[in-house]
C-alpha cells in the first residue's frame, strides 16, 4: 500500500533558507542550487529528504545538507519589504510565505514596506486577499502610523483607500494623525477622520429615526 501524499503546506509554514554552498544532484529528483540561492522548503514530512523550490524548480534536498550547509531566513517577506526588493517579495508570495507573519517586533511585512516608503511593495502586498491592514506591533503602531511618521503621503493615501483604520492608538495613545510629520499626511488623515465622523453621526441618526418609527 503506497503512503498517502503529504498534506499541502499552509501559508506561513514554508521554511526559507539561503544556500551557503552549491549542491550537485545525484538523481533527477534532487534539486540543484548554487551558493547564495534562496530555497523554499515546502514539505518536511520525510526526515531524510525535504521537498524544496529554488528559482521555480522543485525537487528533493537531503535534510542534513539544509541543516548543516544552509542559513535559515526567519522573516524573508519582511526582509524583502524592508529592502524594497520586489522580485524577492513576489517570489516569497509565489512560494506561499505567509503575508501576515510577525517578526520579533510584532510587525508585518506591510508595516516595513510603509516604513521604508516602498510603494511598489505596498501595492504588491495589497494584491493578497487576506492582507491585514491594521495589525499593531509591540509598540502599538500600525502600517498607517509608520507611513504617517515617515511622511509618505502617497502610501498614507493607499492605506486609507484600502480601508485602514484611523482610530487606532499606539502604546503612547497616539493616532496616526498625531504621528504625521508633514502637512500632506496630516491633511489626508484629518479628511478621512472627518468623513468617518460624519458617517458615524449619519448612522446614529438613521438608527434613531428607525427607533422613532417603531
UniProtKB/Swiss-Prot annotation:
Just give the chief location class: cytoplasm
Q: In the record, which positions carry N-acetylserine?
A: 2
What positions does the domain SH3 occupy? 12-71
InterPro entries named in the record: Ankyrin_rpt, Ankyrin_rpt-contain_sf, SH3-like_dom_sf, SH3_domain
Source superkingdom: Eukaryota
Compartments where located: Cytoplasm
| Gene3D superfamilies xref list | Ankyrin repeat-containing domain (1.25.40.20), SH3 Domains (2.30.30.40)
Q: Which GO terms describe its cellular component?
A: cytoplasm
Keyword Acetylation recorded: yes
Pfam families assigned: Ank, Ank_2, SH3_1
Listed GO biological process terms: signal transduction
Question: Keywords assigned by UniProt?
Answer: Acetylation, ANK repeat, Cytoplasm, Phosphoprotein, Repeat, SH3 domain
Its biological purpose: Induces bone resorption, acting probably through a signaling cascade which results in the secretion of factor(s) enhancing osteoclast formation and activity.
Quaternary assembly: Interacts with SRC and SMN1. Interacts with FASLG.
**The protein's name:** Osteoclast-stimulating factor 1
Q: Which organism is it from?
A: Bos taurus (Bovine)
The top of its lineage is: Eukaryota, Metazoa, Chordata, Craniata, Vertebrata
